[in-house]
């Protein structure tokens, strides 16, 4: 694997569904960690406040529920991912690319139906806690959602 002129490695998993979340804002995640890669082959990833034994995007904030939401692949060709709120108090919100307003997926303490995500949607976890831009690419990552060769900008989803 060789890097391009920007030090970014090409994607080697072209046949597998991946979703990239580009951090737009967060009070709880390290500043230099900007991209989370969700692998759709293994059931996706949970989002929550506490540590977990399964892949998780951990957001240690009281505004985020212990088991806040799930992201998962619903189609490989074309690549499709969905998000579902698991009954959080402060909500999971999605703003479509062409919209200026957010839609809450479900009322407080009620699980939502899966919401199909589209390229460049914005997902907000909690009222104002953390926001991510959704990136769904058929092939290589764009400059905004690429992880550098050193991996320094990747948000780990490993079980903790």
Specify the residue positions occupied by each region the protein language model found.
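Intrinsically disordered, low-complexity acidic Ser/Thr-rich regulatory segments
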Residues: 1-62, 76-78, 116, 121, ...
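Amphipathic hydrophobic-ligand
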Residues: 64-66
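Forkhead-associated
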Residues: 55-56, 68-122, 126
